[in-house]
Structure formats: C-alpha cells, structure tokens
C-alpha cells in the first residue's frame, strides 16, 4: 500500500497558506505603522524648529508668531503629528480591516496631504518675499537683517515638504488598500440600462 505524504494533505496546505498570509499581513502592518510614525517625527521636528524661531537684533525683534503663514504651519504640523500617532496605533492593532475604517484612512490621508501641502506652499511664498522683497506691496528684504530667522524658517519648511511626500505615499497606500480590497459591485436594472455601484462593508 502506498503511503500518503502528510505534508501534501489539503489540510496541511491550507494551514501553510494561512500562516503565509498572516506573515504577509504582519509585515505589511509593521511597514505601514512605521510609515505613519515617520511623518509624526518630522512634523514634531518642523513644529519645534518653527516654535523656537525668534531673532532679536539692532533692527528689532521678529518671531514666527508675527507671520500668519508660519503660525498656520505650526498648527498644521501639530495636527498632522497627532493624526500620524493615532493612525499608527490603530494600524498596529492586529484586527481585520473594515470598509468604514478603510474609507476613514483614505479620506483623512487625502485631506491632510492637501492641508500640509498648503501650509508648506504658503510658508514658502512668505519666505520668498522675506528673502527677495516686493516693492509693489512695500515688503522689504527682511532676511538681510534677520538671516538666522529665515534660515530656521527654511529648515522647518523643507521638513514640512518631506512630510508632504510621506503623506502622498500614505494616500497612495490607503487608496490601494481601499479600492483593491473592496470592489464596487454594479447593480443593473433590466430594461432601463441603469447601473449603480454599491459598496458592502
């Protein structure tokens, strides 16, 4: 009588496939968690650099709080840091993904990507005006007198744009996870030629 190889049994194959899927999910979860923690650290760095950005000399005193764009940059970096930490904790939890959760990550990642991009863009414009000046709006070249202030502002803005890149990557990831896992089934009404896409959790 020919002996059956236990390793090739359907049950063993199923268990092996399940273990492999769990390993892949754990690896993916760890990678996404780290990807969400990186912008948190960057946001805190940009925030701290800008908060400490004050210079006083013979020409007077200048602080980040004197410029609305830089205040906005600080607030947005704080919000993004908090969201990054919260989302990293949620992703790190070993629980099955659901449709509402996938949609929440997708929408929040998209919104914060544009918010942090706007903060970086507006701050860049203000820093450019401080460096080059603009005679039409009587804006002098402040960086000539406050070089240290402008240098710290530049560092904070550069870090912020690195955060933008991280959030763009997160947006792509959350988009892929949502639309690859949850297809939109189409309901067709006979005789009317009407198709409606529906989602199920």
UniProtKB/Swiss-Prot annotation:
Keyword 4Fe-4S in record: no
Source taxon at top rank: Eukaryota
Membrane topology: Multi-pass membrane protein
GO CC terms in record: plasma membrane
Keyword Hydrolase part of the UniProt annotation: no
Extracellular topological segments: 52-72, 123-152
Keywords noted in UniProt: Cell membrane, Membrane, Transmembrane, Transmembrane helix
Entry's localization field: Cell membrane
Region (Disordered): 1-27
Record topology, Cytoplasmic segments: 1-30, 94-101, 174-201
One Pfam match: CASP_dom
Main localization, broad class: membrane
Positions of transmembrane segments: 31-51, 73-93, 102-122, 153-173
Similarity comment: Belongs to the Casparian strip membrane proteins (CASP) family.
Subunit structure and binding partners: Homodimer and heterodimers.
Name of the protein: CASP-like protein 2A1
Organism whose genome encodes this protein: Populus trichocarpa
